């Protein structure tokens, strides 16, 4: 089996994590794909568990792994480090899975530079900026200042959408999930 690396990026609140969770519950998702768990220095949110959503590490631990060339991609986002370790990708490739990387545009650029055509990329867009703000507020996990900062960064993030192989506007969740499933199916058969 040729394993592919699927990069998925989106502004915070566009529905990336929800779509991925739903996709991984489908027959094709659960049998053929695995999400690489990233390292981060941010604090866990309520309900998040170390080594399930992220590997939560200190800044010193992250920087040590970074100095050992242990990441395929990393970035500092909203004052915290995020990165995907080489060891995590090796672990998933050994299982024979297609790998999904839930990363930002900077990490996507780094990953495409390493893996070339083996890396497929999807950018998920919100239907509008107003809807995006509503979603962020509804999550009830960030302060108003954090939401305002995230909204300031959206234009920069969206400006990189044309670097991706596939753009998906997450307006209707069911339709977006169906489109995402089709994209994954088509790209493992090609």
UniProtKB/Swiss-Prot annotation:
**Keywords on record:** ATP-binding, Cytoplasm, Kinase, Nucleotide-binding, Transferase
Tell me the compartments it is located in.
Cytoplasm
Span of domain Guanylate kinase-like? 3-185
Kinase in keyword set? yes
Please classify the protein's predominant subcellular localization into one broad category. Answer: cytoplasm
Question: Per its UniProt entry, what is the enzyme's top EC class, as one word?
Answer: transferase
GO molecular function term, any single one: ATP binding
Q: Which GO terms describe its cellular component?
A: cytosol
> Which positions bind ATP?
10-17
Q: What is its EC number?
A: 2.7.4.8
Q: Which CDD domains match?
A: GMPK
PANTHER family, per database record: GUANYLATE KINASE, GUANYLATE KINASE-RELATED
Which family is this protein grouped under? Answer: Belongs to the guanylate kinase family.
- What protein name is recorded for this chain? Guanylate kinase
Q: From which source organism is this entry?
A: Francisella tularensis subsp. holarctica (strain OSU18)
